[in-house]
Amino acid sequence: FGFGFIEVGTIPPKSQLGNPKPRIFRLEKDKGMINRLGFNNDGIEVVSKRISDNFPNGVLGINIGPNKNTTNKLEDFIFCLTKIHEQADYITINISSPNTEGLRDFHHKDSMKDLLDKLNKLKKLKKIKKPLFIKLSPDIKDSEISDIVELIFKYNIDGIIISNTSDSTRERLTDSKKKEKG
């Protein structure tokens, strides 16, 4: 036995420290965790080299997202896909993190349409054949689900990854750390 695949990321274009520590909280009473990592890593260029130098054979997924302080999240996704697609067996487009302000706005129909349209055009232009997965929030509103599904089919997204940290289920928790952001 072993791992069927490995996914690395979320990797943004530029290096960033992520959120201040502590970033992970164990909720012992609730048998759960809260995280607020904030995509802490060395950025797409350094991670790409690290993958080239160190990754053995096997299935590799690469999860991409925008920098926390970017002025254009959409362009960050385009930049990362352009830089990393040759090294990945599949690419995950992470729009699920509650720890990157405004990232979950891509769940709204017009924003998701813009994102998927640009990614699709880039795939055609660069002849990218790698599967694209989209990582969704567990806090999607019922009213958004049909629009999201419609766009996923329209743009031939290959897979869906659910989920990430939820912001909406805290009222059931009993641990004293339940109010930590993440």
What are these regions (language model features)?
Residues F1-F5, R36-V46, T71-H85:
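Glycine-rich anion/phosphate-binding loops
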Residues G4-V8, N35, L60-I64, I91-N94, ...:
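Hydrophobic faces of well-ordered beta-strands that scaffold small-molecule active sites
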Residues G9-V59:
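A gly/proline- and charged-residue-enriched helix-loop-helix capping module
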Residues T10-K21, G32-N35, D89-K109, T169-E171:
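Glycine-rich, proline-tolerant flexible connector loops at the mouths of alpha/beta enzymes
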Residues I44, S48-S52, I78-H85, K109-N120, ...:
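Generic structural signal for well-ordered alpha-helices
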Residues P66-I78, D105, S111, F133-F153:
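Active-site glycine- and acidic-residue-rich loops that bind
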Residues P98-S111, L151-G182:
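Glycine/Thr-rich beta-alpha phosphate-binding loop at enzyme active sites
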